[in-house]
Amino acid sequence: MKYTSYILAFQLCVVLGSLGCYCQDPYVKEAENLKKYFNAGDSDVADNGTLFLDILRTWREEGDRKIMQSQIISFYFKLFKNFKDNQSIQKSMETIKEDMNVKFFNSNKRKQDDFERLTNYSVNDLNVQRKAIHELIQVMAELSPAPKIGKRRRSQTLFRGRRASQ
């Protein structure tokens, strides 16, 4: 009976271990493929700290994290664009980009398209520069929190002070 328990426990471990391989997110395998292609597993990659992880650890509030994440995703989209003609890593980049779309953009295609359009604007294009400066005041107004609409309450001490002096 004792050996039967060991055999059953071993079989359970094998089954659970194999399920773990199939349940893994698809981007993990593709990220490993990109690591091999870019030799990103080498020890010298860790020199001088991380690019993004320390920044993400610093910011805990959801709004702050979204700002940082948007810049990081923008970087990855530009990186993938530079290697779009490389057939050996094309599938990996597409899989990861699709997963980013699901996780960051909530599968909202329009949101992703607008994001990519923003990241593709060239800062060196004179027409883009002129339009950006033309829209600057409105963009700055959008950055400010909306004013709270409502009546302001006057301090009761003002009225009490006047009554006392009269």
Curated annotation (Swiss-Prot):
Q: Which residues carry this modification: Pyrrolidone carboxylic acid?
A: 24
Q: Give compartment(s).
A: Secreted
Q: Is Iron-sulfur among this UniProt entry's keywords?
A: no
Q: Give the signal peptide as a residue range, or say none if absent.
A: 1-23
Tell me the subunit arrangement.
Answer: Homodimer. Interacts with IFNGR1 (via extracellular domain); this interaction promotes IFNGR1 dimerization.
Q: What does this protein do?
A: Type II interferon produced by immune cells such as T-cells and NK cells that plays crucial roles in antimicrobial, antiviral, and antitumor responses by activating effector immune cells and enhancing antigen presentation. Primarily signals through the JAK-STAT pathway after interaction with its receptor IFNGR1 to affect gene regulation. Upon IFNG binding, IFNGR1 intracellular domain opens out to allow association of downstream signaling components JAK2, JAK1 and STAT1, leading to STAT1 activation, nuclear translocation and transcription of IFNG-regulated genes.
Name of the molecule in the record:
Interferon gamma
Q: Which organism is it from?
A: Callithrix jacchus (White-tufted-ear marmoset)
